[in-house]
């Protein structure tokens, strides 16, 4: 499945996302050119009892957001409701490749050319978050210096606090 919002999409909208539901697998997707995020999983504040849970995104291409902040996606669940990101390519997003809160597995992914907003953003919230981060590759792209710091100064992992356990 290919989802490409493009320049004619509504400003501030994600190319694809999940607000509620359970037991979903998104496989072999290409999600690009979002006007805010490319692919996000966020609970719907209008349905607090029906948060997304047990969701997997795998073998997918997520990238090339169009807005100036160009984001891969927000993956925000509770500490009990998990999301697995497995064997994906996050490419050419300035930030949020992804930004995660809650229960998350980030395994065997590639993040290329993450810009100055950070590659894997860890929580930055008071909410307890737990992540299993294994065997990922972070590849310096055209907007990064070879020392792993961006032109703006961000390393691959950012915004860690005491509420985020990896």
Predicted regions and their residues:
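Right-handed parallel beta-helix
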Residues: 1-7, 14, 20-36, 45-75, ...
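Acidic/polar loop patches that form or flank catalytic/metal-binding clefts of enzymes
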Residues: 118-119, 143-148
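Extended alpha-solenoid helical-repeat scaffolds
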Residues: 152-157
């Amino acid at each position: 499945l290919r989802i490409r919002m493009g320049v004619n999409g509504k400003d501030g909208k994600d190319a694809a996302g999940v607000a509620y539901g359970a037991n979903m697998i998104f496989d072999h997707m290409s999600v690009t050119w979002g006007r805010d995020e490319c692919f996000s999983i966020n609970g719907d504040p209008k349905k607090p009892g029906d948060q997304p849970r047990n969701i997997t995104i795998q073998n997918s291409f997520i990238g090339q957001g169009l807005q100036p902040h160009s984001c891969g996606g927000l993956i925000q669940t509770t500490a009990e409701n998990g999301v697995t990101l497995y064997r994906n390519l996050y490419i050419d997003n300035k930030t949020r490749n992804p930004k995660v809160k809650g229960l998350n597995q980030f395994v065997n992914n590639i993040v290329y050319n993450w810009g100055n907003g950070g590659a894997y953003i860890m929580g930055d919230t008071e909410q307890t978050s737990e992540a299993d981060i294994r065997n990922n590759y972070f590849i310096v792209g055209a907007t990064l210096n070879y020392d792993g710091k961006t032109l703006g100064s961000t390393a691959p992992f950012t915004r860690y606090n005491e509420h985020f356990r990896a």
